[in-house]
Amino acid sequence: MMIINVLLCLGIFCFLLYAFYDQFFMDCWKGKTLLKVHLKKQGQKDALIFSLLIGIIIYQTYTNLSSATLYLLTALILLSVYAAFIRAPMLLLKEKGFFFGNIYFQYADIHQVNLAENNILVIDMKNGKRLLVHLLTDQDREQVIQFFGGYK
């Protein structure tokens, strides 16, 4: 059981580092944030299934688990609920690039930007990758389009 507790602690610690990076560090990193746009939340069903599976594990092995393991599994459920239902993904537009999916892309690496149906911004990169940015509202779409230079 000790190895399970160590792995759970390590996973929770890594998630807390990620949450700190996501909420505080990305705003300050790589220059000033010129535009911050909230995106559609995805993966809520996955997090719900994950939480239910952990709940089933707790229910099935309640008598065999130590109290520390129970607390760590409960913390894992709370973190997955935070990640899926409370935290909002963001598109951070900076001076020389942008953060999408917590990864920094430079504007010089963009080949083409298109707008698809349902407020989906399609960013084609020069390396052949395609980023699908699911914008939340029409107002967000207009702000991003104006940031990239308007309709052409």
Curated annotation (Swiss-Prot):
Transmembrane spans = 1-21, 45-65, 66-86
Subcellular location field: Cell inner membrane
Family to which this protein belongs: Belongs to the UPF0266 family.
**Organism of origin:** Pasteurella multocida (strain Pm70)
UniProt cross-references to Pfam families, sorted A to Z? DUF986
Which region is the signal sequence? none
Identify its membrane topology class: Multi-pass membrane protein
Q: Which InterPro entries match?
A: DUF986
- Gene Ontology, cellular component aspect: plasma membrane
Tell me the protein's name.
Answer: UPF0266 membrane protein PM0830
Q: What is its main location?
A: membrane
Q: Which residues form a coiled coil?
A: none
